[in-house]
């Protein structure tokens, strides 16, 4: 698990077995490792595969992200849908914005409480044009974001080590990592 700077994310066609039907778009991603948050990795850059049922992986919309990558044999894979956009604070440390949506708020409770941050103007989430103003307000609560035009600017945030703990205790555990039971897991 690491903070990475996007170098490239390109779609590819994976080689599949005769009776295998892939329901996801496949991407090869290359990132510069800015900060290792958990695990071991010796390189300055990392390459991994990402699969997304909705098309282009959302993490690729951001220059920097906290990414959750696992090894399977000799290949590295992104843990499907698991990421946080992150931004460098004036102190130089990496932080993610406040929670996006009710589920993220629930998952973070007691682990990564968002607090006011002195963000730069590049700390925002782009808003999809098809989202209604009601959808935007529901996803980007006014205590954590300021919506201006097509951007939700961050007002609060949490450090990356706390955000890692959120995923570790929730979805990654459910997927059988960190002492969880993958047999009970679902996406």
Spans of features found by a protein language model:
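Basic, polyanion-binding surface patches
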Residues: 1-83, 171-172, 179-184
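Netrin-like (NTR/C345C) domain of secreted extracellular proteins
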Residues: 64-187
């Amino acid at each position: 698990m690491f903070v990475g700077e996007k170098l490239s994310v390109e779609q590819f066609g994976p080689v599949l077995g005769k009776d295998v039907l892939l329901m996801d778009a496949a991407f090869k991603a290359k990132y510069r490792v800015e900060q290792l948050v958990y695990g071991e990795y010796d390189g300055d850059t990392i390459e991994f595969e990402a699969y997304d049922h909705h098309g282009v992986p959302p993490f690729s919309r951001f220059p920097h992200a906290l990414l959750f990558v696992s090894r399977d044999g000799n290949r590295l894979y992104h843990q499907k849908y698991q990421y946080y956009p992150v931004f460098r604070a004036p102190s130089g440390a990496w932080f993610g914005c406040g929670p996006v949506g009710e589920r993220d708020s629930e998952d973070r409770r007691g682990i990564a409480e968002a607090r006011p941050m002195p963000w730069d103007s590049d700390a925002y989430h782009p808003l999809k044009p098809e989202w209604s103003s009601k959808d935007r307000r529901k996803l980007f609560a006014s205590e954590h974001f300021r919506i201006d035009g097509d951007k939700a600017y961050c007002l609060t945030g949490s450090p990356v080590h706390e955000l890692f703990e959120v995923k570790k205790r929730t979805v990654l555990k459910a997927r059988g990592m960190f002492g969880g039971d993958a047999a009970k897991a679902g996406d």
